[in-house]
Regions:
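Amphipathic, small/basic residue-rich leader segments at the start of a protein or domain
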Residues: 1-78, 86, 96-100, 246, ...
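Glycine-rich phosphate/cofactor-binding loops in nucleotide/flavin-utilizing enzymes
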Residues: 11, 58, 62-63, 80, ...
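C-terminal helix-coil-helix/basic helical segment that borders enzyme active sites and/or dimer interfaces
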Residues: 24-27, 280, 284, 288-291, ...
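Internal helix-loop-helix
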Residues: 38-105, 146-152, 301, 308, ...
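A short, Trp-centered hydrophobic/proline-enriched beta-strand micro-motif
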Residues: 104-112, 154-156
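A structural signal for short hydrophobic beta-strand segments in well-ordered beta-sheet cores
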Residues: 126-129
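A short core secondary-structure module
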Residues: 133-134, 138-186, 196, 222
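Glycine-rich beta->alpha junctions and the first turn(s) of the following alpha-helix
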Residues: 181-302, 376, 412-415
């Protein structure tokens, strides 16, 4: 029997009724999230057996908005691990990991890139060798956000060197709190330290902590990366109108801790919001060339927002992440570069003065923009990789010739 899909209004009414009986401002954040998870309203688009309601993807935003309008905390840390394990993991993993992930009891990080395997992620060389009931892991990962306080990691390692490179990779869940895992912060040229490098020396993973199948982890990795591109824009937690109490205070503290890592992300995106007023304040808006470049920037920014809307609309219909993610990321990179160009035109040589200098424009924000924008074209997959994804998967263009294609990775890595 086909069940009729509820309307947004009926979903909102049901959420309001539930929150009325369940929300208590005196609850701790963990206790409140336990209630959310148990009710299915934490991630309503997930299946009912896995803490959801079996609703369409658009219901997630509808429910979060209604929970907040009722004065309750609506944020739940599903991250990238949640949808990946839900889609690709076995049932015992869903039972073991999804609930503590949603309640915030366990923090996750992503351990994919390596010093010599960033854009060519399938060229990774971190190894995992089965030893009885455990995998023994050795190697190095890099550009790992949140690794310094994570409990678990989404982790890729090579488990077979005698097959083509994409075929010998396995996707694991790595316990981070063990002697064989060393995490070191990476200091960036904009003086932030948002990422880490992780050194693995005989670290151990339970034999069955494999997402998908052994040697077939590339499929699961693609699912994670698709979600990363699709949800690449950081959404700030919203707390307006929420009843004061322990849950709100803890949610604010949690959001503030997460935000430390991303404090420079607005600068990485180019700070388009500052351009017009800055041009007016300096008189640069009287220059027709500057005005032309500002108009170009604002047009690009508007087009980029439409691409983001397309991605959201695709998700609302339940369609898996498609080329909109890569197209949107490219658009954001182009906007950021154009914004940096315009900021430099407006501020001139003063654009390079840091915040400590009294002559620095906007307290050094422009200088931080100029040295942060290059990251927009690298993080989460370089512009070149996005072009390849669009050409290959969306346009059906032939791939670049690869003389090592089909060779065992033990041989192919020498090309």
């Amino acid at each position: 029997m086909i069940r009729a899909m509820p309307s947004q209004d009926s979903i909102r009414a049901e959420v309001r009724e539930w929150v009325k009986g369940a929300w208590d401002p005196s609850l701790s954040l963990r206790a409140w999230r336990e209630r959310l998870v148990e009710s299915g309203w934490a991630v309503p688009s997930w299946p009912e057996q896995w803490y959801g309601k079996g609703l369409p993807p658009w219901a997630d935003e509808v429910v979060r908005g209604e929970i907040q309008r009722c004065g309750a905390v609506a944020t739940v840390p599903a991250g990238l691990a949640g949808p990946t394990i839900l889609e690709q993991g076995p049932d015992f993993m869903r039972e073991r990991f999804l609930r503590p992930l949603l309640t915030g009891e366990e923090v996750w990080c992503q351990l994919f890139s390596e010093p010599s395997a960033g854009s060519d992620l399938a060229g990774l060389t971190t190894s995992a060798v089965l030893d009885g009931d455990e995998w023994v892991v050795n190697g190095q990962k890099v550009w790992n956000t949140s690794a310094h306080h994570a409990d678990l990691g989404m982790f890729l390692a090579r488990t077979d060197w005698d097959v083509p490179k994409h075929s010998g990779i396995t996707y694991f869940v790595l316990p981070m709190k063990q002697p064989g895992v060393e995490v070191r912060p990476l200091r960036q040229m904009n003086f932030h330290a948002s990422f880490n490098e992780v050194f693995l020396s005989d670290a151990r993973i339970p034999k069955d902590w494999v997402v998908g199948e052994v040697n077939k982890g590339w499929t699961a990795a693609q699912a994670t990366l698709a979600h990363e591109r699709h949800f690449g824009a950081l959404s700030a937690a919203r707390f307006e109108g929420i009843d004061d109490g322990p849950a709100l205070q803890e949610a604010r503290a949690e959001a503030a801790e997460v935000a430390k890592v991303y404090a420079w992300y607005p600068q990485r995106a180019g700070r388009v919001d500052l351009v017009v007023e800055h041009a007016k304040a300096t008189g640069a808006n009287r220059d027709p060339i500057v005005r032309q470049e500002i108009a170009r920037l604002l047009s690009m920014h508007r087009a980029s927002s439409w691409t983001a809307e397309r991605a959201r609309a695709a998700r609302a219909t339940g369609r898996p992440p498609g080329p909109e993610g890569s197209i949107g990321k490219l658009a954001l990179s182009n906007v950021a570069r154009q914004a940096a160009k315009v900021h430099a035109m407006i501020a001139g040589a003063h654009a390079m003065l840091a915040g400590a200098d009294p002559a620095s424009p906007l307290g050094g924000v422009i200088a931080e923009v100029l040295i942060s924008v290059p990251a927009q074209s690298i993080a989460g997959g370089t512009d070149e990789i996005q072009h390849n994804i669009i050409g290959d998967r969306a346009l059906g263009l032939p791939r670049e010739p690869d003389p090592a294609k089909g060779l065992p990775y033990r041989e192919a890595r020498n090309y």
